[in-house]
Amino acid sequence: MKSTSKIYTDKDSNLDVIKGKRIAVLGYGSQGRAWAQNLRDSGLNVVVGLEREGKSWELAKSDGIIPLHTKDAVKDADIIVFLVPDMVQRTLWLESVQPYMKKGADLVFAHGFNIHYKLIEPPKDSDVYMIAPKGPGPTVREYYKAGGGVPALVAIQQDVSGTALQKALAIAKGIGATRAGVIPTTFKEETETDLFGEQVILVGGIMELMKAAFETLVEEGYQPEVAYFETINELKMLVDLVYEKGITGMLKAVSDTAKYGGMTVGKFVINEDVRKRMKEALQRIKSGKFAEEWVEEYGRGMPTVVNGLSQVQNSLEEKIGNQLKDLIQKGKPKS
């Protein structure tokens, strides 16, 4: 098992490395808004690049950030930060960034997908690096304003200048990440582990596990309302415990009956066959097969995603969950 020997913090980073450089943040969604405001509040020169004037444009202006059309934002930028969705980045790069960016400008990413799978092929004279915060944009902003920061990953793909790591850590400091800690990785590792986590546990795995457990109880004649509470709703409490105290802390917090049942039946359900399928899923990611399929799916208008979402929305567990929302919210203490 390999482990990192270095975690970068504030003492390893210096904003002076990028002071005076113009930073163009492309996109003003969850991460874009947080990054732009945090970098601005750290005393850096920030503009936002957007494809059109709309809600995001007006929001940036109301936040005190200068919005520009993407072409105008990148032409004078020393550092270009891609914070638009993965599947928009290639088109944005080809149409609005590559033809207009100045020679030698840095390219920065928050996720390695487009670089790792070569959807974007950067110029050979650009530094290319990644800062990947391990939290959503609003949390990145909230923690920064409170004097803290969200941990992040850092990776260097191209280091033409010899100072790519220093600049990456300066960006990390600018968004508050070095207050918590920044872990070195690679574009390959970040991309493959991120996709794997989404597919086998965070989205795909947990969704199908909840669905299968709920349907098993309902098929055996149990009330769907009771099944929903036991297989879906209570998950939040357990995840919160793991988040706050780790798996050991969660186990200590549940009943002895739950501990024994979990430790014996858990391995029966998540058995060697499941682990084998997880490895198969990982191989699809590593080989580029998943990326190839996803690019094709996106180009066809995402029919699998659209149909899948419709099925979930019309499922019994979703209908029961919607019916129980008022009951669940009713018991929450008023703040």
Swiss-Prot record:
Reactions mediated catalytically: (2R)-2,3-dihydroxy-3-methylbutanoate + NADP(+) = (2S)-2-acetolactate + NADPH + H(+); (2R,3R)-2,3-dihydroxy-3-methylpentanoate + NADP(+) = (S)-2-ethyl-2-hydroxy-3-oxobutanoate + NADPH + H(+)
Q: Which domain of life is it from?
A: Archaea
Top EC class, one word: oxidoreductase
**A UniProt-annotated Pfam family:** KARI_C
Detail which positions bind Mg(2+) 1: 194, 198
| Cofactor list | Mg(2+)
Provide the KARI N-terminal Rossmann domain boundaries. 5-185
> Where is Mg(2+) 2 annotated to bind?
194, 230, 234
Q: Which residues bind substrate?
A: 255
Gene Ontology terms describing biological process: isoleucine biosynthetic process; L-valine biosynthetic process
**Keywords tagged on the record:** Amino-acid biosynthesis, Branched-chain amino acid biosynthesis, Magnesium, Metal-binding, NADP, Oxidoreductase
Q: Could you tell me which PROSITE patterns the record lists for this protein?
A: KARI_C, KARI_N
Cofactor binding: number and manner: Binds 2 magnesium ions per subunit.
Q: Which GO molecular function, any one, fits this protein according to its record? A: ketol-acid reductoisomerase activity
Q: Where are its TM segments located?
A: none
Q: Where is the active site?
A: 111
Q: What is its EC number?
A: 1.1.1.86
Tell me the pathway: Amino-acid biosynthesis; L-isoleucine biosynthesis; L-isoleucine from 2-oxobutanoate: step 2/4; Amino-acid biosynthesis; L-valine biosynthesis; L-valine from pyruvate: step 2/4
Q: Where is the KARI C-terminal knotted domain?
A: 186-331
Similarity section? Belongs to the ketol-acid reductoisomerase family.
Q: Which PANTHER family match?
A: KETOL-ACID REDUCTOISOMERASE, MITOCHONDRIAL (PTHR21371:SF1)
Name of this chain's protein: Ketol-acid reductoisomerase (NADP(+))
Organism, scientific name: Saccharolobus islandicus (strain Y.G.57.14 / Yellowstone #1)
